[in-house]
């Protein structure tokens, strides 16, 4: 790889028995990203690591050195990585019949237990959930995945990353958790697993309205806007 291409490379792909990086690249890929690359690409391990990609630590550095903006090529590189994932999984990001969903996990050069954030099921929307229900045959599973996305996205992206100060010291995650607990109490449920598909569908609707009321904006219903 040339110096120019390496300097402009911000996304490292792994999957299909191959990986752009390895375990020696923790400064660039973070501990989690480097280890995933090693597991996915090591010829002797042959571990069934699902395809994915790592956005390098250099993007974080760039962001803070350039007035909170991203490298101009980052969006294209992420889209190229998503295309590779689609080819390997047979699913398509944003597709209404067979949607590809992704987990977004933060990482760092050094281990920071309890400090990292996660967003699950990015790519779920009012339209793509229909495909997840069709593919899984489980409406309850699909709406449980959707309500988890809304809770995580509102907390991590719309509040914390946006620098929004929680009203009354109560963050959006706490507000949504209380709504979830209220439904469980009213229905006499002992755990989240007792919630029915109808319960979760109603919670999703309530969560969306609550996020808009508390944070003043809606959860993105476009897969690409969720991701980028």
Segments predicted by a language model, with ranges:
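Nucleotide/phosphate-binding sheet-loop regions of phosphoryl- and nucleotidyl-transfer enzymes
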Residues: 1-228
């Amino acid at each position: 790889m040339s110096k120019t291409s390496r300097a402009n490379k911000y996304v490292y792909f792994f999957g299909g028995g191959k990986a752009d990086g390895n375990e020696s690249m923790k400064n660039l890929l973070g501990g989690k990203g480097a280890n995933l690359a090693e597991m996915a690409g090591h010829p002797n391990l042959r571990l069934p690591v699902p395809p994915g990609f790592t956005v390098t630590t250099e993007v974080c550095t760039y962001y803070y050195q350039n007035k909170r903006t991203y490298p101009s090529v980052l969006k294209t590189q992420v889209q190229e990585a998503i295309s590779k994932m689609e080819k390997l999984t047979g699913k398509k990001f944003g597709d209404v019949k067979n949607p590809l969903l992704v987990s977004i996990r933060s990482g760092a050069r050094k281990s920071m237990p309890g400090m990292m954030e996660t967003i699950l099921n990015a790519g779920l929307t009012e339209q793509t959930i229909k495909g997840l229900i069709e593919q899984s045959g489980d409406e309850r599973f699909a709406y449980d995945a959707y309500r988890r996305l809304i809770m995580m996205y509102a907390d991590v992206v719309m509040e914390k990353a946006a620098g929004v100060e929680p009203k009354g010291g109560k963050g959006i995650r706490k507000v949504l958790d209380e709504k979830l607990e209220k439904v469980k109490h009213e229905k006499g449920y002992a755990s989240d697993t007792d919630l029915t598909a109808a319960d979760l569908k109603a919670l999703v609707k309530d969560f969306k309205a609550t996020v808009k009321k508390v944070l003043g904006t809606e959860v993105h219903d476009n897969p690409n806007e969720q991701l980028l």
